[in-house]
Amino acid sequence: MSKGTSSMGKRQKRTHAKCRRCGSVSFNVHTKQCTSCGFGKTSRMRTYKWQAKCKY
């Protein structure tokens, strides 16, 4: 098992596909979870407080 240049040529499969719920290309095909909206992991939309700009 090498982790250098020779193994970089084997990386040609798609990791992320288009999500059914949010439409962004962030649905992981292997884990079956969307990193943008959380589809496949939770029924609620994925959102965090730190995503919004802080208003002072």
Swiss-Prot record:
The keyword RNA-binding applies. Its cofactor is Zn(2+). InterPro entries: Ribosomal_eL37 (IPR001569), Ribosomal_eL37/eL43 (IPR011331), Ribosomal_eL37_CS (IPR018267), Ribosomal_zn-bd (IPR011332). Binds 1 zinc ion per subunit. GO terms for molecular function: rRNA binding; structural constituent of ribosome; zinc ion binding. GO terms for cellular component: ribonucleoprotein complex; ribosome. It comes from the Archaea. Zn(2+) binds at C19, C22, C34, C37. A zinc finger (C4-type) spans 19-37. One of its GO terms (biological process) is translation. The keyword Mitochondrion does not apply. Binds to the 23S rRNA. Belongs to the eukaryotic ribosomal protein eL37 family. This is Large ribosomal subunit protein eL37. The lineage of its organism: Archaea, Methanobacteriati, Methanobacteriota, Stenosarchaea group, Methanomicrobia.
